[in-house]
């Protein structure tokens, strides 16, 4: 019977359907009732899937095409299913002779084989022609073509309605749709039979459309039931770009490929197309099973749904790749990936476990095993380049939701990104990976626009959920995200990573739930107060939210625990207020790096940020600006670590710029302001060793008011530039203060003053003995005229500049012009009594009167302290305890002699440990002293140095300095830098010597081919030969197979003064024995070795990748042997210092450099042969040249950077050796070589290692003498394969360093 050969236009209405959306649910009825998607899924499962799955997945499984499907779903389907369809009649066709002869011939499959058993006719109800198995759709056709070869075309078999068709053509190629497409469908009747069509071929190529379970004709008559199409290939399944595969309601497509080649569907695959218009009103299902595809599964374009709530399922293999995925606005696609170990259930139904008991009246049925949901295996992946939704203008309350669900370990959406088509009433896209991770590389678009807005009156919603079942998955977005107006994004994951910037429009909601969230930059500045406010809802993050930069305007921020590197609060300088609200309790671990308040529009239209509540907020820096406020009054404590800088006042009615409950200025933090202070502190203010920088403007400075208590906490740290205590309050340009008026600096109900140690602990007894803390605080209240201290002057001996500076500070021109007249102040500290300071329980204030003038050496002065040790090498600075005006003038003034201030010696003196200075010099020398100065003083300050030496005894200090100096000497040594290369070279010397011994053999037992030896003697006389053995020896293995390829595993170690260096790697090469006019050995090699080093204290650790390459040769002249060798080496070293003591902790750092070497060697030896050349003794002498070097390096430390310039060295050596070789058999040997190597010349440069200004020069070693012994041998394993082993030991007779290396290798000769 002829079938249609002309292409027909498909003009029937089509829609999308799906099936497996619910297959990943936890259990029936367990989903959240308020979730419309899952609510619909439950109903859909019970009302549609269980009965309808019979015609799709279950029937496919019954014939083995979907084995391994979710077992619980399959079992449920089987419960609802009737018995499998049984054909009334089975027709069989077998391809006979001829079909197996022509592999390049093409056949028409229908005409050649099928037509005899397929009938066709007119379907009056549907007004169309259709085809069926001969004698009725309840029959089956089996086609046996398993021996057939060639290509078989099936084209135009349209409206094949059953029954079953099974074509076995395992050695042939099936080509579907050469001229026209094919349509496989079914008819629904009382039995609801399923049409099953199976093609088993070597290769399958789809050229034209394929329809599965489409209607026949108009569809007005009999409807389609269900159809399963199985395409099985042992090699390749491919569809062309114009070959569309359409799965209609009730369709299942099984793809089976047993090869590792991918299945490539370049044509569009459309799931859920419906047969007729009325079907748009009902759900639908369709399924693709790729679980039996061994290679990757590739869809170029996959569409799900058209104009209905289609549900589709893919039972996938390990890796599924989709180019473009189109989802209809209400469609859903579930991609189920195999669990670890595959789909096969670990538990099987076994009827034998439940035998029938005839004695019982009740019959016990077999146990049914139902598996629950599962996670995809760790290597399962779903890749989608571009995800897109399609929509129409249909209105529905709550809008429509499209969904993509999977259980893969990784769901990856590529650079094509995600597009959500939005229409009135709103659209939502849900992307969920129930058990694994989600990664989105591309952008999020609305209506194909980046930053596109939702349709007016609607919202566009993106939802991403990762690991909902496991609570341990990551959602990652690697591109910028632009959310336009009314576009919302929700992300649920254990860890959410946003590696691009996020830009929020008006009325936008960004919601994240999970354990932690990491953001780059978030810009929420486009929103306005009211309906246009944007929301950052991170309240569902249980641990911490990390944001690099957050910029807000009218923004609601719901966040509990955060670390924001920078918070920028802006009003966009518009004529309406913009207010940011942190609407959650922020707890006690939240932190902001920098708060930047940008200037508002006006007092009436300001901006600001408010915190609803919290226990503690730590801020590094705050920058205030007018008409923009920071209200943290509901946070119990706010701490400032670095800086508060005030701008001009904002004058906002009812709102002051910065508002706190309790505010703490931490150590090293500063607060800068002038005549106005836009600050409210309703609780306590604590200055914990910070600095309040006050700038005089218009003759005044502002007053800091604390609602309750103010605390001034200070220490005895000295300002290294002035010699004074570091001030807590510093008044700049104090000379401009209005005279004779009390200027209140701090006001509180109660002010307390506390003196603490450098590290915050209670200070020592010497300081605590002075109980007048208010007077001590006054020394931390400093007045400056430019950079010159006004309230106290210090004049050092022979220093007129100090007198001039004092005169400029107090406005005394005489002291500036004639400093010689005031030399009586040398060695004194003078107090300016014209300045009155107040520090009591409620007020801190200053009153600047007329500056006093020095008149003599005793009035208002005190002597600078002098050194009390026997050797007056250093000036001392100390706390003045018994000055003449100790409690009335300047108590506890720290005075110093500037030229020796800041030395490590002065710190020891202040600690009353002057004798330890001598110990330091005696045991560690000037180099140890300089190292201590660099680590403690130059890199920190005297206070830090004091803390370190207080915690360390003199003996510990010297021991640690000596260990550090030794380590730094080691670093500077070129011998250390090239140790890995030297060990690698030693290993190769052993291997090369073994190769030369092997190829120098002149002994053999190889006498098997005696006829060849006699042939070689033809026309010669024995008397004309030097030795008859020479003729026989020409048949030794080295002549028959003169070329060798060898490879060795090498290892070595070096021991030197407790340090340990090791190396392991491999070496390989090729060599040959040449027997022409010149008898010689030539070869080349290359090697790699990884070396590691650690010193005895484990404070220096190194790892290096080393390579070595070179050539070698030996020339024979009778018993004389001349050896030549040249090689080069390069090493890349990564080293680190790891000192465990606190004193040396600043030395801990890492660095990288390159080391290199070049070597040439030449030697001469003479062979003394015994026992027919079986034993050879060879003395030899030689010379060598070695060039060593290293590049410069600088460490990654910001505190004490270690650096070293490049180094280079040239070495000349002479050596003498004696070698014993023993040859046995035809190929085996053993040798031992012992000798002495002496350096006789060395010159080059070796730069010092530097720590800032501190330098360590490498120790210059004397010329070295080495003793060396090496031995090795070789055994034959197979005809051309040999095993060799060698060891070498090298000992430095000068430094007592030892080096050991060994090798194990193989050789192949040819």
UniProtKB/Swiss-Prot annotation:
**Cited Pfam families:** Autotransporter, VacA
Protein origin, superkingdom? Bacteria
Q: Which residues form the Autotransporter domain?
A: 1038-1310
Q: Which UniProt keywords apply?
A: Cell outer membrane, Membrane, Periplasm, Secreted, Signal, Toxin, Transmembrane, Transmembrane beta strand, Virulence
Species of origin reads Helicobacter pylori (Campylobacter pylori)
Gene Ontology CC annotations of this record: cell outer membrane; cell surface; extracellular region; periplasmic space
Q: What is this protein called?
A: Vacuolating cytotoxin autotransporter
Q: In the record, what terms sit under GO molecular function?
A: toxin activity
Which residues lie in Polar residues bias regions?
Answer: 350-364
Give the region (Disordered) as residue ranges: 339-364
Q: Which residues form the signal peptide?
A: 1-30
Per its database record, what is this protein's job?
Induces vacuolation of eukaryotic cells. Causes ulceration and gastric lesions.
**What does UniProt say about this protein's domains?**
The signal peptide, cleaved at the inner membrane, guides the autotransporter protein to the periplasmic space. Then, insertion of the C-terminal translocator domain in the outer membrane forms a hydrophilic pore for the translocation of the passenger domain to the bacterial cell surface, with subsequent cleavage.
């Amino acid at each position: 019977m002829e079938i249609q050969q002309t292409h027909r236009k498909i003009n029937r209405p089509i829609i999308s359907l799906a099936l497996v959306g619910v297959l990943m649910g936890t259990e029936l009825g367990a989903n959240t009732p308020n979730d419309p998607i899952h609510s619909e899924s439950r109903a859909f499962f019970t009302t549609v899937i269980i009965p309808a799955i019979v015609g799709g997945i279950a029937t496919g499984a019954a014939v083995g095409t979907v084995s391994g499907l979710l077992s619980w779903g399959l079992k449920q389907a089987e419960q609802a299913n009737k018995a499998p369809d049984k054909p009334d009649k089975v027709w069989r066709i077998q391809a006979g002779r001829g079909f197996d002869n022509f592999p390049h011939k093409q056949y028409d499959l229908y005409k050649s084989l099928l037509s005899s058993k397929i009938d066709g006719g007119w379907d009056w109800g549907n007004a169309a022609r259709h085809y069926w198995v001969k004698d009725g759709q309840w029959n089956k056709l089996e086609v046996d073509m398993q021996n057939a070869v060639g290509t078989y075309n099936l084209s135009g078999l349209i409206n094949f309605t059953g029954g079953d068709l099974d074509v076995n053509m395992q050695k042939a190629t099936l080509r579907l749709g050469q001229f026209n497409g094919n349509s496989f469908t079914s008819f629904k009747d009382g039995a609801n039979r399923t049409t099953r069509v199976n093609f088993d071929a070597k290769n399958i190529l789809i050229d034209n459309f394929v329809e599965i379970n489409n209607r026949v004709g108009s569809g007005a008559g009999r409807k389609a039931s269900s159809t399963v199409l199985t395409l099985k290939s042992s090699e390749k399944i491919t569809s062309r770009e114009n070959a569309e595969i359409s799965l209609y309601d009730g369709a299942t497509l099984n793809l089976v490929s047993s090869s590792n080649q991918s299945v490539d569907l370049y044509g569009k695959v459309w799931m859920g197309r419906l047969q007729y218009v009325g079907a748009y009103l009902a759900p639908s299902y369709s399924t693709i099973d790729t679980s039996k595809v061994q290679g990757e599964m590739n869809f170029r374009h996959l569409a799900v749904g058209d104009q209905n709530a289609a549900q589709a399922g893919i039972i996938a293999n390990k890796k599924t790749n989709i180019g473009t995925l189109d989802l209809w606005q209400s469609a859903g696609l579930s991609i189920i990936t195999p669990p670890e170990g595959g789909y096969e259930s670990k538990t099987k139904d076994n009827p034998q476990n439940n035998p029938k008991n005839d004695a019982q009246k009740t019959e016990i049925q077999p146990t049914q095993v139902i598996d629950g949901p599962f996670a995809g295996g760790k290597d399962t992946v779903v890749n989608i380049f571009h995800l897109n939704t399609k929509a129409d203008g249909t209105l529905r309350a709550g809008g429509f939701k499209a969904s993509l669900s999977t259980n893969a370990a990784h769901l990856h959406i590529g650079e094509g990104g995600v597009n959500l088509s939005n229409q009135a009433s709103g659209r939502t896209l849900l992307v969920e990976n129930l058990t694994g991770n989600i990664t989105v590389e591309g952008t999020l678009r609305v209506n194909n626009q980046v930053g596109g807005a939702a349709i007016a009156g609607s919202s566009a919603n993106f939802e991403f959920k990762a690991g909902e079942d496991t609570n341990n998955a990551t959602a990652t977005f690697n591109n910028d995200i632009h959310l336009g107006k009314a576009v919302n994004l929700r992300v649920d994951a254990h860890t959410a990573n946003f590696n691009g910037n996020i830009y929020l429009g008006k009325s936008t909601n960004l919601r994240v739930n999970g354990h932690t969230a990491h953001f780059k930059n978030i810009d929420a500045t486009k929103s306005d107060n009211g309906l246009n406010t944007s929301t950052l809802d991170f309240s569902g993050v249980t641990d911490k939210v990390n944001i690099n930069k957050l910029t807000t305007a009218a923004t609601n921020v719901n966040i509990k625990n955060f670390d924001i590197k920078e918070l920028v609060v802006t009003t966009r300088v518009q004529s309406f207020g913009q207010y940011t609200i942190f609407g959650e309790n922020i707890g006690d671990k939240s932190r902001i790096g920098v708060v930047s308040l940008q200037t508002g529009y006006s007092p009436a239209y300001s901006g600001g940020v408010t915190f609803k509540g919290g226990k503690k907020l730590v801020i590094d820096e705050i920058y205030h600006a007018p008409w923009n406020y920071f209200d943290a009054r509901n946070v119990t404590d706010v701490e400032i670590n670095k800086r508060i800088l005030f701008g001009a006042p904002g004058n906002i009615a009812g709102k002051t710029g910065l508002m706190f409950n309790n505010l703490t200025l931490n150590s090293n933090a500063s607060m800068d302001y002038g005549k106005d202070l836009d600050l409210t502190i309703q609780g306590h203010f604590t200055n914990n060793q910070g600095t309040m920088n006050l700038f005089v403007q218009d003759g005044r400075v502002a007053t800091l008011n604390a609602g309750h208590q103010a605390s001034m906490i200070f220490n005895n740290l000295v300002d290294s530039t002035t010699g004074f205590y570091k001030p807590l309050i510093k008044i700049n340009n104090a000379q401009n203060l209005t005279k004779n008026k009390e200027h209140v600096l701090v006001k509180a109900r109660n002010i307390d003053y506390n003196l603490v140690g450098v590290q915050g602990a209670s200070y020592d007894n010497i300081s605590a003995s002075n109980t007048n803390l208010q007077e001590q605080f006054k020394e931390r209240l400093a007045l400056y005229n430019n950079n010159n201290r006004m309230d106290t002057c210090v004049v050092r001996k022979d220093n007129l500049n100090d007198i001039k500076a004092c005169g400029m500070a107090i406005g005394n021109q005489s002291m500036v012009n004639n400093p010689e007249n005031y030399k009586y102040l040398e060695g004194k500290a003078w107090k300016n009594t014209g300045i009155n300071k107040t520090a009591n329980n409620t007020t801190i204030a200053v009153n600047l009167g007329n500056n006093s003038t020095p008149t003599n050496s005793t009035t208002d002065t005190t002597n600078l302290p002098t050194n009390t040790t026997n050797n007056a090498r250093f000036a001392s600075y100390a706390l003045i305890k018994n000055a003449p005006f100790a409690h009335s003038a300047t108590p506890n003034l720290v005075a110093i002699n500037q030229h020796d201030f800041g030395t490590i010696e002065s710190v020891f003196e202040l600690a009353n440990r002057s004798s330890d200075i001598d110990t330091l010099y005696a045991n560690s020398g000037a180099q140890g002293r300089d190292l201590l100065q660099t680590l403690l003083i130059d890199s920190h300050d005297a206070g830090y140095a004091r803390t370190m030496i207080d915690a360390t005894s003199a003996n510990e200090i010297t021991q640690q300095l000596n260990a550090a100096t030794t380590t730094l000497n080691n670093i500077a040594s070129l011998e250390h830098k090239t140790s890995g290369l030297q060990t690698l070279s030693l290993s190769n010397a052993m291997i090369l010597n073994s190769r030369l011994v092997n190829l120098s053999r002149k002994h053999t037992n190889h006498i098997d081919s005696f006829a060849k030896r006699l042939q070689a003697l033809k026309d010669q006389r024995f008397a004309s030969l030097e030795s008859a053995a020479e003729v026989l020896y020409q048949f030794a293995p080295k002549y028959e197979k003169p070329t060798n390829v060898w490879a060795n595993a090498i290892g070595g170690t070096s021991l030197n003064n407790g340090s340990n260096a090791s190396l392991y790697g491999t070496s390989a090469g090729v060599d040959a024995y040449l027997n022409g006019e010149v008898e010689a050995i030539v070869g080349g090699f290359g090697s790699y070795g990884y070396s590691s080093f650690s010193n005895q204290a484990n404070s220096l650790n190194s790892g290096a990748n080393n390579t070595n390459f070179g050539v070698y040769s030996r020339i024979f002249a009778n018993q004389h042997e001349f050896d030549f060798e040249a090689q080069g080496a390069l090493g890349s070293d990564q080293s680190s210092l790891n000192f465990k003591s606190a004193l040396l902790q600043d030395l801990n750092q890492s660095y990288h450099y390159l080391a290199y070497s070049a070597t040439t060697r030449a030697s001469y030896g003479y062979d003394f042969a015994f026992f027919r050349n079986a034993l050879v003794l060879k003395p030899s002498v030689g010379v060598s040249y070695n060039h060593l070097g290293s590049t410069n390096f600088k460490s990654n430390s910001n505190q004490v950077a270690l650096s070293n310039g490049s180094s280079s060295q040239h070495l000349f050596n002479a050596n003498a050796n004696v070698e014993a070789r023993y040859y046995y058999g035809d190929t085996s040997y053993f040798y031992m070589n012992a000798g002495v190597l002496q350096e006789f010349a060395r010159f080059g440069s070796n730069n010092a290692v530097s720590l800032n200004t501190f330098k360590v020069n490498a120790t210059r070693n004397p010329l070295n003498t080495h003793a060396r012994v090496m031995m090795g041998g070789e055994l034959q394993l197979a005809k051309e394969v040999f095993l060799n082993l060698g060891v070498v030991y090298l000992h430095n007779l000068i430094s007592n360093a030892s080096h050991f290396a060994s090798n194990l290798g193989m050789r192949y000769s040819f």
